[in-house]
C-alpha cells in the first residue's frame, strides 16, 4: 500500500516530467520559428536558382515537421498531467478507504 507521501512524491515527479517535456517542445518551437525560419529567409534572399528552391522547400517541410513534433510533445505533456491527476485521485481514494477500514 502506498503512503500519502509516496503518492504525492510520484504525482509531483510526473508533473515535473510533463513540465520538462513542455520546455523541450517550447524550445523546439522557438528553434523552428525564429532561428530556422530566419535561416531559411537568409538563404532565400542570397541563393537563387532551381536548387535553391528545392532546398528551401525541403527546409519548409522540415520546419513543418518540427512544429508538428512540438505540438505532439505538448499533447504528450498534457496527457501525462491528466493521467497523473487521475492516478493521484484514485490512489488517494484507495488510501482513504484503507485508513478508514477497521479490522
Residue spans of the language-model regions?
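N-terminal secretion-targeting helices of virulence/extracellular proteins
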Residues: 1-103
Amino acid at each position: 500500500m502506498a503512503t500519502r507521501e509516496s503518492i504525492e512524491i510520484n504525482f509531483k515527479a510526473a508533473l515535473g516530467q510533463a513540465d520538462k517535456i513542455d520546455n523541450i517542445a517550447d524550445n523546439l518551437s522557438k528553434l523552428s520559428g525564429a532561428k530556422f525560419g530566419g535561416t531559411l529567409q537568409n538563404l532565400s534572399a542570397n541563393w537563387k536558382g532551381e536548387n535553391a528552391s528545392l532546398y528551401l522547400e525541403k527546409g519548409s517541410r522540415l520546419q513543418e515537421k518540427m512544429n508538428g513534433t512540438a505540438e505532439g510533445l505538448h499533447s504528450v505533456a498534457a496527457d501525462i498531467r491528466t493521467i497523473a491527476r487521475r492516478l493521484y485521485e484514485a490512489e488517494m481514494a484507495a488510501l482513504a478507504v484503507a485508513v478508514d477500514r477497521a479490522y
